[in-house]
Amino acid sequence: MSKIIGIDLGTSNSAAAVVISGKPTVIPSSEGVSIGGKAFPSYVAFTKDGQMLVGEPARRQALLNPEGTIFAAKRKMGTDYKFKVFDKEFTPQQISAFILQKIKKDAEAFLGEPVNEAVITVPAYFNDNQRQATKDAGTIAGFDVKRIINEPTAAALAYGVDKSGKSEKILVFDLGGGTLDVTIMDFGDGVFQVLSTSGDTRLGGTDMDEAIVNYIADDFQKKEGIDLRKDRSAYIRLRDAAEKAKIELSTTLSTDIDLPYITVTNSGPKHIKMTLTRAKLEELISPIVERVKGPIDKALEGAKLKKTEITKLLFVGGPTRIPYVRKYVEDYLGIKAEGGVDPMEAVAIGAAIQGAVLKGEIKDIVLLDVTPLTLSVETLGGIATPIIPANTTIPVRKSQIFTTAEDMQTTVTIHVVQGERPLAKDNVSLGMFNLTGIAPAPRGVPQIEVTFDIDSNGILNVTAVDKATGKKQGITITASTKLSKEEIERMKKEAEQYAEQDRKAKEQIELLNNAESLAYSVEKTLNDAGDKVDKETKERLTNEVKDLRKAIEEKNTENVKTLMDKLSKDIQEVGAKMYQQASANTQQSAQSNSQNSGSSDGKTVDAEYKEKS
């Protein structure tokens, strides 16, 4: 039986693994161990003679061929961005597919058999479009993508597969090349369930590399008066040296940085030769590492947990190999991290375990992911009405009944948005469609059932059905938006920043909606009442409705509230009078019927009865 391999398609590095005889094994790259261990750099390059290079060979020639080299393509997944290389253009899916093709080839060489099925991981914050783009990349590479799963979830599988004896609250600290993801999960009875996610899209190993680069460049500038950061070739060499030093200082106390012929001046060639200690590295990266507290606190808040309630701490990503990073996070949470898994390999191993679960090779594990942002429909006044809240476990299917806003309305527009803001316009539009053929009826009568269905890959399907006619329309949310992980973080920050402003805006819209409903209700009551309401009262209430509608149009909330209170009170009084009148008429009619049915001649007739002996 063919294997399902697990793939960590990373921004900086990629890796793959497979379960053999019940044990996860990392698939070695054909080039052997690189600076990233068994993982290989997510680089794709095209030479001027038309050759394509992937992985370490592409990275090695980047200095000499910068215009033909592409890296960090993952950041553009789910967008319509095109990478321009010489006279050709490539989509992010194509570049990712080249990386996946290399993985496929390496896996087939390692296993000695065709490999066609895969589980691919994505960041927890990836939206529907980015997940779909990742799946498309797998298809382009020749894979049948069986599942798209979140990277922190995969890591938890890697650490937890042999430790399913009791219930756990797990915090996954995933610090990669460019981003930090903090995920809190609940584990029990073989089920992993994501409780919350948080992160920082501008915090990662590259920030640490940049701090080292600046230290070296500042030192050189002080001595030579030259800023090497302005020379692209010199900068790339500095960056590579900084990354190498950072990795070496995870296991040693000092390392030498030797960069001969870094630049040339009128006085001749210049060189860099210096020693960097672990203590100096820790001093340089300390301000960067301190920023992890915010995302950790947010994740704890989202999961409604205290630091003391976390029972397992899992590290993922190359920078978590740095002793200072590990100690800082462990001290902040007051718990030692789990060992036994290389943080650089954890995600690929977890994906491989999920592949084995799907194949039935590993049993008694169930994987439950969550949707990172709230999914809503736009309703009257531009309000985003939530259907599926953020951090809802997927797969999930939820429905809600809506109605029409106008009399005899035969078409409704379903506008799907994603985000945490109360108003639709402040969120990201995922798509829209029209449901036509609704049976004409007064507003508020038709019943439109809107259903959001998210599958196990996080792909969203939306349908709308008119309950009366059975008319149905739907949409699958694919690449219709350019929402990135950065935008998700921005949206969450904006949601906090503008919370009070949003609350007031939403309250105003709801007030105006309620006012319009009251005006409509009063008009309908007066029309239905006919001559049961005297002419003078009708005119007075009609004028009040006109005044209210004018205030609604002017969006004068204070005036709207005053007029609503008066109109509500007046219509209630009219309603009470109509009820009393109807009640009096009913009693009068009942008495009349009683008198008429008593006797036709007005005499009382005694019934005869015989006593039973």
Swiss-Prot record:
Keywords: ATP-binding, Chaperone, Nucleotide-binding
Region Disordered: start-end pairs: 578-613
GO terms of molecular function: ATP binding; ATP-dependent protein folding chaperone; unfolded protein binding
Record carries keyword Transferase: no
Biased composition range(s): Basic and acidic residues: 603-613
Domain of life of the organism encoding this protein: Archaea
UniProt xrefs under InterPro entries: ATPase_NBD (IPR043129), Chaperone_DnaK (IPR012725), Heat_shock_70_CS (IPR018181), HSP70_C_sf (IPR029048), HSP70_peptide-bd_sf (IPR029047), Hsp_70_fam (IPR013126)
Entry-linked Pfam families: HSP70
Keyword ATP-binding: yes
Coiled coil: none
Low complexity: bias regions: 580-600
Family stated for the protein in its record: Belongs to the heat shock protein 70 family.
Family matches, as HAMAP family: DnaK
Stated role: Acts as a chaperone.
The protein's name in its UniProt record: Chaperone protein DnaK
